[in-house]
Regions:
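Positively charged n-region of N-terminal signal peptides that target proteins for export
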Residues: 1-4
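Post-signal peptide N-terminal segment of mature Sec-exported envelope proteins
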Residues: 25-48, 55
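A structured, mid-to-C-terminal "fold-capping" secondary-structure block
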Residues: 135-252
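Bacterial signal peptide processing site
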Residues: 18-21
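Mid-length scaffold segments of soluble, non-membrane domains
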Residues: 74, 87-152
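C-terminal motif of bacterial Sec signal peptides marking the signal peptidase cleavage site
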Residues: 13-16
Length: 252
């Protein structure tokens, strides 16, 4: 798989970054679909995901949720390692390797960020950022079922990152139904924990917005553009939490 990814980047890297390929003009063609899908996701969140996340928040405290968040953040380090390598950031690749080893062992499977105390700060990046570096255009804004706000490049990047994750390899290498249930259960915990952590933020965005769809779209696009920009400048230390996107994420 990685050979295919490297080959794709090598070919696409020959292109030039044309501003005319931003896909902005195509957004309006998808507007009706996007709004309908946004409403579907909103109702799904309102009637299922948010109540579960609220119940979860009521039986946990901030310390516990931070340990869960830190555990899953640590599982993203191999993804950062691969993408930093693909971007030619050798130093950052080494830091990601070091962080994963240190935090998985001394940090109790990543529940504590011991590496940061040793000066090994997180060098977060994604395959989305890797494609951006090789001049692959973002494409139009689109809302996907359950996943939420996205773009074609973001979706490809998100999928590629998922394939690099230890969680994926745990699923693909397991023949046991019990093990699969454990992996799927922990994955569900990841997203419920993320939703609980972002509860106040999303409620505030909704209550202060005249048009929640437009506000969510604007927040998503601005956050990802800033994240991609900061990744290209190697300025990870200044990156705030961009796991705000309504799918996942993954928090810092």
């Amino acid at each position: 798989m990685y050979k295919k990814i490297l080959l794709s980047i090598a070919v696409l890297g020959l292109c030039s970054c044309a501003s005319s390929s931003s896909g902005v003009g195509e957004d309006s063609k998808l507007e009706a679909y996007n709004k309908a899908m946004f409403e579907f996701n909103y109702q799904l969140d309102k009637k299922l995901i948010k109540p579960v996340a609220t119940g979860y928040a009521n039986i946990t405290n901030k310390f516990m949720r931070n340990r869960v968040k830190s555990f899953f953040n640590n599982l993203e380090e191999p993804t950062y390692m691969v993408n930093n390598l693909l971007q030619g950031e050798i130093k950052n690749t080494g830091i990601s390797v070091g962080r994963f080893v240190v935090n998985t062992t001394l940090g109790l499977f990543g529940m504590f960020d011991v590496a940061a105390g040793w000066g090994l700060e997180k060098k977060k990046t994604t395959f989305d950022a890797t494609m951006a570096k090789y001049c692959i255009p973002d494409g139009p804004f689109v809302v996907l079922p359950v996943v939420g706000p996205s773009t074609p490049r973001h979706l490809v990047g998100w999928t590629a990152d998922a394939y690099m994750s230890p969680i994926y390899w745990s699923l693909s290498n397991s023949d046991s139904q019990k093990e699969n249930l454990i992996v799927w259960g922990t994955t569900g915990l990841k997203y419920i924990n993320l939703r609980a952590e972002n509860m106040a933020l999303l409620d505030s965005l909704e209550s202060s917005s005249v048009d929640f769809y437009e506000a969510s779209k604007s927040a998503f696009m601005q956050n990802r553009k800033k994240f991609i920009s900061l990744c290209s400048k190697n300025d990870e230390e200044d990156i705030p939490n961009y796991d705000f996107d309504f799918e996942e994420d993954y928090e810092d």
